[in-house]
């Protein structure tokens, strides 16, 4: 992923700004390739993680149009008898600068060691940038759900219910919401008929993934995959399977060394570190979410005694990411009176779960609601 860096002469990099720009670009590209969100990220409205380019830390306001809901007119009725409303929805994202740096040992040890330090630092900073950004995406996705489903054990039925709710605009209590747009639709020819292929992405943590594998209905699905010869393809692509045309992914478990999906055993501070308070209306950590679930269960004379695992269904524009086009790469060889080198990277980044508000004060179904996320919650076992 960083193969192009092998052709760069690092001896003169501190005196060549163009080399620094090239290294920064390679770091940014490589950090995305390592990301599980890479395949669903882009600038289009049909991407799961939607990118916006910003040049400064000024607040950025992405906008969308709400679906027209009027009944129109018919016959000889004048237009003015029933005007529709073009609702523009927006939210504010506050980009922030984030970066990291490393300092070398004294240069007197060897010039070769200095060059190796720069190369190794580039690789380590790439991995750091990837994990830092991905944890911000995951934290934004799983913070303060407005729509979620809880089950003791993750299974095919719960995932199918989430997909049904997403397609038909329902909440966990079956109240009306709005349909979630699927991620990038493709046209597929079936015989002489063109069929639109749409899908949501299901992200589960490893505990939920193992629960799903133990589900008898999922085992039957796996037999169908094997019969169709698709099981090996899914194995090598990292997919658990496909349910109702929606890929199901084992995204791993959040911990200090891994991005993964969060659970209620992680500390509040570890989760909150990846949320910019300016970009959220409220913070509900996984621990607090478990307490919220317990309060709801208490009303039904039940309680959740175990930790909870948190996954989610995501649709188009679930997460909005406003950032600078390029990652800046720095080398300072004047540290400690010129005895040491400092290597660093930084960029602008604002991450927020899509949650829009009407711009003209008219209340819409979208106001303060997760635009394209449904939480999938189960006991952590």
Curated annotation (Swiss-Prot):
Keywords: Coiled coil. The keyword Coiled coil applies. It comes from the Viruses. InterPro entries: ORF017-like. Residues 287-307 form a coiled coil. This is Major structural protein ORF14. It comes from Helicobacter pylori bacteriophage KHP30.
């Amino acid at each position: 992923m960083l193969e192009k860096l092998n052709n760069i002469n690092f001896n003169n990099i501190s005196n060549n700004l163009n080399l620094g720009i090239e290294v920064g670009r390679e770091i940014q590209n490589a950090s995305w390739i390592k990301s599980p969100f890479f395949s669903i990220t882009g600038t289009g409205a049909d991407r799961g993680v939607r990118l916006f380019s910003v040049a400064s830390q000024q607040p950025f306001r992405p906008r969308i149009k709400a679906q027209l809901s009027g009944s129109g007119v018919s016959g000889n009725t004048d237009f003015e008898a029933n005007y529709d409303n073009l609702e523009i929805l927006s939210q504010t994202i506050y980009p922030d600068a984030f970066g990291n740096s490393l300092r070398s040992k004294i240069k007197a040890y060897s010039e070769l060691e200095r060059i190796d330090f720069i190369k190794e630092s580039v690789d380590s900073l790439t991995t750091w940038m990837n994990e830092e950004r991905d944890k911000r995406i995951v934290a934004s996705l799983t913070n303060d759900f407005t729509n979620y489903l809880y089950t003791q054990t993750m299974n095919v039925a719960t995932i199918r219910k989430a997909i049904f709710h997403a397609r038909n605009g329902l909440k966990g209590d079956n109240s009306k919401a709005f349909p979630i747009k699927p991620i990038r639709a493709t046209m597929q020819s079936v015989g002489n008929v063109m069929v639109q292929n749409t899908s949501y992405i299901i992200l589960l943590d490893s505990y939920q993934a193992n629960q799903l594998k133990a589900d008898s209905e999922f085992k039957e699905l796996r037999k169908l995959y094997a019969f169709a010869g698709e099981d090996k393809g899914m194995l090598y692509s990292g997919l658990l399977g496909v349910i109702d045309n929606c890929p199901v992914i084992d995204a791993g478990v959040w911990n200090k060394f891994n991005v993964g999906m969060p659970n209620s055993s992680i500390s509040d501070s570890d989760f909150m570190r990846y949320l910019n308070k300016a970009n959220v209306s409220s913070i509900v950590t996984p621990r607090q979410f478990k307490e919220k679930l317990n309060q709801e269960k208490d009303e039904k004379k039940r309680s959740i005694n175990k930790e909870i695992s948190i996954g989610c269904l995501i649709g188009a524009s679930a997460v909005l990411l406003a950032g600078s086009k390029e990652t800046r790469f720095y080398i300072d060889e004047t540290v400690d009176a010129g005895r040491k080198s400092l290597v660093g990277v930084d960029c602008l980044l604002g991450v927020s779960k899509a949650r829009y508000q009407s711009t003209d004060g008219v209340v819409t179904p979208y106001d303060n609601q997760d635009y394209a996320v449904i939480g999938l919650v189960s006991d952590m076992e």
